[in-house]
Amino acid sequence: MKVVIIGGGTAGTATAAKLRRLDENVEIVILEKNNEFAVSNCSFPYYISGVIKDSRQLIGATAESMKEIYNTDIRLNCEVEMIDRQEKTLRITGKPDESYDKLVLATGAEQLRPDIDGVLSEKVMTVRSLRSIRNLKDFIIGNEVRKVLVLGGGYIGVEMAESFVKLGLEVSLIDAATHVLPNFDADMAAPIHNILRGRGIRLYLQRQIAAFDEAQAVLSDGTRLDYDLCLIATGVRPDLRLPVLAELEIGERGGLKVNRHLQTSDKDIYAAGDNLEIENLITGRPVMFSNASLAVKQAKIIAENLSGIGSEFSPVVGTSITPVFDYTAAAAGCSEKMLQDNGIDYFKLNIYQNTHAGYLPESGQMLFKLLFAPDGKILGVQGLGQNGIAGRIDTIAAIIKSGGSVAQLEEAEICYAPAYASAQDAVNNLGSLAQEVLSGKIRFAFYDDIGKDDVFLVDVRMPEVFQSGHIDGAINIPLAAIRNNLDSIPHDKRGILYCNRGVGAYKAACILDNRGFDNVFVLSGGSNLFSEIMEDKSQQ
């Protein structure tokens, strides 16, 4: 059997490697249109910032090593023009046709380049290939660049903006959305915005670039920004030129449609990586999800199917993670917008918790948001903090993958020692609070509830803390004084209790609930999150 793989990125090389480990006799050919392959696009920001010194470190393998270790024929500078499905041949630019028994499309995605006046200027660049990232760095060094625009607030946009700041450049980030990082909700994006602004990045949200001239970019609201360089980071779309020419079926989201075995509408043609649609575990709907980890999993499934092992690619949770200077932002599952778009009912809550025992000097703060269904099924989680975020999000993602509920979060056995976690870890607390929400024991209010006419706002912190600053309209009843001030809290209004992080307010709410108050709420995320959101709004 002869297997030809079009594309030498993560999906293509991983397919070849796994297939060779399973079958020593199969003939494997990789056709790559560029002169380099196995390039780690995800590491481009680290090359720009100088963490990675040599661009050759971005290359994960060479044609020689793939030949020696995996007996794979790597052909660079081979661009496939057309797939002849009837004859099972590939037309290659300037080279003889190539036959195949089985074909794997690992063509990835292509950079979206918006149609903007002046976008073809040499000062307006994209980064999708090794050549392009080298050109970008050379341009910065050779042209005394000081002012940089980043168009696009997704993961690559935010990471590249950070890298430019680390080079000492002035950075403005422009995005048409209301907030950066689309897998996050607005409340969780607010502190991320504040971190970015705190490091000097100017945010221009709900705006686009309308035109470029030689010295300035004109935004959709008329704002003019000086620039020496603009990076286009507006996302990618599947590279479907070959599948469309071959009349393979395209899915409803615009990606290549595949079955659970990752076969296209032609059973002899498989696909892996950024060019295909996959099923979202929570919504049951097709999604486009660019992720190297998923590409490797898909490569394994294809290799096993080509070797006669009947493997299936299961629906995905959808995980993501990115550094934001000294912080880590990570998410798994659905955001509120995704749930709303798919008509899925949900509850939500936010909590702050220490990374580990608070009495240790290295302890930091983490912020989490949990989304869950009325039946307790976990729908999504988002986290932000300086330490400890990845492990918690991964744990919850694994529970989501297994179809788990909030009860399993509370029951999860998390490694404990004071230097690593609290005795009641954030994962457990999220599950515990979610179960109390479902039972009606606790009710949460949110930042947009503040200021409504039917709300009575109570700050349960100590008087000296209250005097140093509080939410407008709040009265102060310290937690220890709640029982002696029951008459001060009306029954005919929604009582919203808050403290810094929500712990004291939760304790006060339990007291009031046990005293017959059935209209008491805890401000989700406390005044800390409320302040982050208000600060963000004040800067917009």
Where are these regions (language model features)?
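Mid-to-C-terminal Rossmann-like scaffold of FAD/NAD(P)H-dependent oxidoreductases
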Residues: 1, 7-8, 275-387, 422, ...
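Beta1-alpha1 glycine-rich phosphate/pyrophosphate-binding loop at the start
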Residues: 1-72, 112, 161-184, 319, ...
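N-terminal Rossmann-like dinucleotide/flavin-binding domain of flavoprotein oxidoreductases
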Residues: 18-102, 185-202, 337-338, 429-432, ...
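A Rossmann-like FAD-binding core segment of flavoenzymes
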Residues: 25-27, 69, 74-92, 97-98, ...
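Rossmann-like dinucleotide-binding cores of NAD(P)H-dependent redox enzymes
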Residues: 59, 147, 155-210, 289-294, ...
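Glycine-rich dinucleotide-binding loop and its adjacent helix/turn
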Residues: 107-167, 202, 258-260, 475-481, ...
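FAD-site-proximal beta/loop scaffold in flavoenzymes
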Residues: 120-144, 215-218, 224-301, 395, ...
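Rhodanese-like catalytic fold shared by cysteine-dependent sulfurtransferases
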Residues: 407-418, 422-445, 450-456, 462-496, ...
